[in-house]
Amino acid sequence: MKTQFVVLLVALVLLQMFAQSEAIWGALLSGVADLLGKRGLKNLDDFDDIFDDDLSSADLEFLKQLMR
């Protein structure tokens, strides 16, 4: 009975390790695929424009229309 329990625990640990490593490898492979894709080499960081401190009058008018 003890041997069966130990075999069950070892099997569960190995299965859990396999499941987690598969998720890690999947995430790494999708990241590499994104880098090598058509849009992967472009800088798609849109957060640089958020901190623009100079606003034109057209920008202010657009913001006023949004806040109505």
From Swiss-Prot:
Main location, first listed in the record: secreted
Leucine amide: residues carrying this PTM: L36
Expression across tissues: Expressed by the venom gland.
Transmembrane segments: none
Propeptide regions on this chain: 37-68
Keyword Ribonucleoprotein attached: no
Keyword list, A-Z: Amidation, Antimicrobial, Cleavage on pair of basic residues, Secreted, Signal
GO cellular component, one term: extracellular region
Localization terms from the record: Secreted
Keyword Nucleotide-binding: no
Signal sequence coordinates: 1-23
Family: Belongs to the non-disulfide-bridged peptide (NDBP) superfamily. Short antimicrobial peptide (group 4) family.
Function, in words: Probable antimicrobial peptide. Shows low inhibitory activity against herpes simplex virus type 1 (HSV-1).
Protein name: Antimicrobial peptide Eval655
Provenance organism: Euscorpiops validus
Lineage of producing organism: Eukaryota, Metazoa, Ecdysozoa, Arthropoda, Chelicerata
